Amino acid sequence: MRAGLLYRALASLGDVRVIVVPVHAVCYEASGLCPADRLTVVDLNGAADVRADLVARVADPLERARVAALHPRPSLSEAATIEVAQSVAGLVGGAPLVLVMREYLAPYLDAVLDRHARPMCILDVDDVESTARRRSGEPAEAERYESLERHYLRRFDHILACSPTDASDLRGRYGIDAMVAPNAVNIPAPRRVSPRWDVLFVANLSYAPNVAAAHWLCHEILPLMPDATVALVGLNPSAEVYSLRAENVFVSGTVPDVEPYYATSRVVAVPLQAGGGTSIKVLEAFAHRRPVVSTTTGVRGLPITAGKHILIADEPQSFADACVRLLDDCSAGKRLSEAGYSLVQEQFAIERVTASLSGALSRLTSNRGE
């Protein structure tokens, strides 16, 4: 979704080429983002982690640990060899503007960042990864991302953050003034259909914090609502998510469109306990006029008032109680969903955010040319 927002904003300024660096085990389908002839996937086959190989050759264990600590690299940046970075630079060519999505892709732009006469380079920090990884209980990976952030953030001409909260985090830790480019969602036409599911959780179901959230929902919360049904819907469910299937738990697998599931569910749950950025899940539920129960983590960075737009609960019993309240009291759910819908219309509708971001990018490029 955020990729689509950024693509739309860039496309309003001129021709856009999309370069996909497939760092995940699964290369998600990107052809729907742009015309096929404007999309290139970088070949990472054989791109060994040279840094890790060199560190492994240091014989003394203490010296090896010291070298590894001096040159940490997040796992998703391990394929950023000199050859791969040069390949990316060749694909960039003479483009006047390069926008990189996600911190871990910054090392793949090394050969471009090192140019004397280089394009304007913008890094989109959808998550402050060091913060997100620390919340996820990954201290070693968090330290690697902190090293990456210290080394790379200032090498970019501009930084985008998805919320004022993340912008403040970057300013406080690195002295960087990031421009806020909020997440945005499409607002669908309302549909009248009979409910099928009591509680819906929509997410990328291969992402570790979402897998943990699904597990918490099904094993800790659902037993406290024995008559309720749950639908887990989203991209590429892990084996652990599939193992949650039961008589009252449905796992969809990857679907082309989540709209039918919103239309046939009564309450949306956002049971996140870790992760960063802002939750598109919450905004998407608001756009579909569905009442939402979320943890505090799930609404981080969003201008939301508990009790007005959403119900917030951080313990299994209180989360279950909030869901049951909305299932039993349709008028309470309607009040929340209408307030959430109004908020999305005013601040997070895709057309509004795209226009604002397009204007900001246009001003940045114009100022550079002066």
Q: Predicted segments — roles?
A:
Residues D157, A263-G277, H288-P291:
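Acidic donor-binding loop of glycosyltransferase active sites
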Residues I310-Q317, R325-S331:
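Conserved acidic donor-binding segment of nucleotide-sugar-dependent glycosyltransferases
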